[in-house]
Amino acid sequence: MISKWAKRFFQMAELVGSWSKDPSTQVGAVITKHNRIVSVGFNGYPHGVSDSADTDEREIKYLKTLHAEENAILFAKRDLEGCDIWVTHFPCPNCAAKIIQTGISKVYCPEQTEDFLSRWGEKIQVSQDMFSQAGVEVTWLPLDILK
């Protein structure tokens, strides 16, 4: 059974993700320690860079976008050793590297849909391998009890 804290932190990650101006993918991340929120982040352009959803082609948008995990790590401005991160989508390899490097010890993520796995399965496997090698615990949260 999922704890009330797990449900709350995942719901918060979803809420924070909804702040993204990206019309196709909204990702949220919440960093916690001992059931206290340390930082939050969502995917989007860096501060001061025009982020109108229709101004850039997809490839240019990808180059400019900070991922939710990156933003949460940057906004924290503190040591994240031993923290947990709650994400709406499984971290890409670049974000996995940053999570590992900061000392975050646990990643909580909802089970991924078949559609998501069909598009990102290879990158998910790379990230999972990185987390496993670095000793970062990954917990998959069942979708049906998160809502």
Curated annotation (Swiss-Prot):
Alphabetical keyword list: Hydrolase, Metal-binding, Zinc
Regions annotated as coiled coil: none
EC supergroup of this enzyme: hydrolase
EC identifiers of the protein: 3.5.-.-
Gene3D superfamilies: Cytidine Deaminase, domain 2
GO cellular component: cytoplasm
Pfam families reported in the protein's UniProt record: dCMP_cyt_deam_1
Biological process annotations from GO: cytidine deamination; pyrimidine nucleotide metabolic process
Domain annotation CMP/dCMP-type deaminase: ranges: 4-120
Active site (record annotation): E69
CDD domains: deoxycytidylate_deaminase (cd01286)
Family in the record: Belongs to the cytidine and deoxycytidylate deaminase family.
Protein name listed in UniProt: Uncharacterized deaminase in luxG 3'region
